[in-house]
Amino acid sequence: MYKRQRLASQKARELINVGKEVEFICVGKKGKASLSSEFGDKIIDFFDFSEVRNLSFVQGDQIAQKIITLFEEDKFDICHLYFSKFESVLTQIPTEQVIIPCNLQVDDNEDSPSQEACYEYEPGEVEILSDLLPKNLSIQVFSALLENFASEQGARMTAMDNATRNADEMIDKLTITYNRSRQATITSELIEIISGAEAL
């Protein structure tokens, strides 16, 4: 699970080496703890949802609103989001996603018309985008929170399954050792009884 922190640290070092200023907003105690040793003075905010039983859009929106506020104050020009993408119970992929500026590229797999379509917007494009872009950011952050949560649960399931399997193997080995010891004790007692009977 620490691979995403390593990915974020590596990117931060690259940016610092070329003279860029880097700041972090951390989500979760472990993420903050792993980044604090090297980038403690660069952590500007921290969100802890460990007491939240069920993640909801509210948590994603809290983080997104903080990002939007900082962006509107011209505190940064690019925002990277780091999280673990859930592939399977055994596989979680550390992922980097640029959420500001907004990615406007069309997917190559999608059929795109050779000629750009002309649309009319009501209200105007600026009004629509000023409403949609913050919601889009909140959704992206919430989606990353859910992916990360699913990855965390998958990693826990795998760890618990491995621990259970190891415990079962240990119980089997201890049972065999106990049975051998018990058998040796019984055999020893039988030999003593037989030796005592022969002596009579």
Segments the model singles out, each with a brief description of its role:
Residues 3-200:
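C-terminal beta-strand-loop-alpha-helix "lid" module of Rossmann-like NAD(P)-dependent dehydrogenases
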